[in-house]
Amino acid sequence: EHYAFVKRHPYQFWMMILEDDCPIGTFYLQKDNSIGLNILEPSQHLVSEVLRYIKENFKPFKEIKSKVPPYFYVNVPYENEKLNELLLDSEAMPIQISYKF
């Protein structure tokens, strides 16, 4: 199922997060330097480790004005208070809140 999903969504990089050989989440990087972070039960340690791994193993794509920023960023649903808190505690800096109408 995951293989088919990844084939349908050609991310720049996609990885399953394992704990004791059991999947507990995923993360992916896209060509616009966005990071998708999907963790079943996020913790400060786990979020920090994933962000550290990304920073140590990847570089953001070159900036394209108004399309691709020169840094990585994570979009988090507004109602996901826990992940928002964990990212702030990991020294991630909030840059925007988006609204749909």
Model-derived regions: residue spans:
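Active-site rim helix/loop that mediates acceptor-substrate recognition in acyltransferases
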Residues: 1-12
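Conserved, charge-rich beta-strand/loop surface module that forms ligand/interface-binding patches
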Residues: 5, 23, 77
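Conserved beta-hairpin
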Residues: 12-25
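A short, internal acetyl-CoA/4′-phosphopantetheine-binding micro-motif in the GNAT/acyltransferase core
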Residues: 18, 32-57, 77
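Short glycine-/small-residue motifs
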Residues: 25-26, 32
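Conserved acyl-CoA
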Residues: 49-71, 88-94
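Conserved beta-strand-loop-alpha-helix junction that forms the acyl-donor binding cleft
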Residues: 66-84, 101
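Conserved catalytic-core motifs of GNAT/GCN5-like acyltransferases
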Residues: 93-101
